[in-house]
A protein has these predicted regions:
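Extracellular/periplasmic, surface-exposed regions of secreted and cell-surface proteins
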Residues: 1, 16-75, 84-383
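Charged, amphipathic alpha-helical segments characteristic of ABC-type P-loop ATPases involved
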Residues: 11-14
Length: 383
């Protein structure tokens, strides 16, 4: 919002921008202030594939992602006793991913088998540096932080996390109508403490393509596709900070004396948030798939919910990440799509879509027992 009166001169007699007062900023100063961000990103990938023997293939692939961001803010002083300031920050990040899979394919008459073993490593690192200063001798040297009479702050940061995964998958198909899939994976994340780092997640699925059965062949002009499926699987989440399991220390000053203080409260018994989902469904198609859709029922159970839980203020902290409880939701889904008009020769189509779903969520368990207390605690520790 501009609050400069229109009768105020924009420039002084010597041609410089008119400095009015603390309460009235000449918009020409705002135009000369600089606030910009610059960024560069690079992604590179290299892969190798080796057919060891017929049906057995080894694949390895490495990916590197690099990003750099720089933010600059230069503010000129806009009144006689004002203070100019500058802030510069820079951040670099790297993500390394190395994936390896060994795949085996085998077909024997009516039997089809696909097996896969895999190993993956993903590592993320970021480095940051920022500095700010104020009270420059001249606005033309705002880009040189060394010329600031007051060095406001200098800060650096480093973040990293690593995820190591092993996994296996087995797919079996018989006569293109009976299908089975089984998977297992183990994930180890540096976001958890040494004793809770690994999570284990199995899953399985069965399917029966009923429309391929002989007793429906005479009705294929009506029932073009019919598939019954069921599955159960467990997945994990590591949606938390890189160092949530560790109590971190930060810098502080007291009476101009340097010191350190706890900056965040860690929890070394944090573990993977897990979700078990069960589902049964039917996929259908009628009259050459002119009418098609699916209907399904599912249940999901989430255990060891990760949540930033409030703690008493007397602890000097506001919250700590914890596994606080479990959720359960269940429901059904139904959808249908109808091709009312389907004339490919004249490029004329008219579709009708309809879907309905119902979901019920229940909080089954809550471990949080935090109580709020007034007041606070000093967080300065003199060394």
């Amino acid at each position: 919002i501009l609050n400069m009166r229109p009768d105020y001169p924009a420039y002084t007699e010597d041609g410089s921008i008119n400095m009015i007062s603390y309460y009235v900023e000449n918009p020409l100063f705002t135009l000369k202030n600089i606030k910009e961000g610059k960024g560069k990103d690079f992604t590179g990938s290299l892969g190798l594939e080796w057919d060891i023997i017929p049906g057995l293939t080894l694949r390895t692939n490495g990916t590197l992602k690099y990003g750099i961001n720089k933010n600059l803010t230069y503010n000129r002083k806009y009144y006689d006793d004002g203070t100019s300031s500058s802030t510069v920050s820079k951040n670099e990040s790297y993500t390394y991913v190395w994936d390896n899979t060994l795949t085996y394919l085998k077909t024997l008459e009516d039997h089809n088998l696909v097996g896969l073993l895999g190993f993956s490593i993903e590592k993320y690192e970021s480095d940051g540096l920022s500095a700010s200063g104020s009270n420059f001798p001249d606005d033309e040297v705002l880009t040189n932080l060394g010329s600031a009479a007051t060095k406001n702050s200098i800060a650096s940061s480093y973040n990293s996390n690593t995820l190591v995964s092993t996994f296996a998958r087995l797919e079996y198909k018989f006569k293109n109508r009976y299908l089975a899939t089984f998977t297992f994976r183990a994930d180890g994340s540096s976001k958890f403490g040494p004793d809770k780092r690994w999570g284990y997640f199995p899953s399985g699925a069965l399917a029966w393509i009923i429309s391929e059965e002989n007793f429906l062949k005479d009705y294929s002009h009506i029932v073009s596709y019919l598939k019954l499926r069921a599955s159960i699987g467990k997945t994990g989440s590591q949606n938390l900070g890189n160092y949530a399991w560790r109590t971190l220390m930060g810098s502080a000053t007291y009476n101009d004396a340097p010191g350190i203080k706890p900056s965040s409260l860690g929890n070394d018994i944090l573990q993977w948030e897990s979700q078990v989902q069960k589902e049964i469904g039917l996929d259908y198609g009628f009259w050459d798939d002119r009418i098609r859709g699916s209907i399904g029922y599912y249940q999901k159970k989430v255990d060891n919910l990760l949540y930033s839980d409030p703690v008493p203020y007397s602890s000097s902290f506001s919250s700590v990440t914890q596994n606080i409880g479990s959720l359960k939701n269940k429901g059904f889904e139904f959808d249908v799509k109808v091709d009312i008009i389907k004339n490919t020769q004249k490029d004329l189509t008219w579709d009708f879509d309809f879907n309905v779903a119902r979901n019920i969520t229940t909080l089954e368990k809550l471990n949080s027992e935090a109580e709020y207390f007034g007041g606070g605690a000093y967080d300065y520790f003199k060394i």
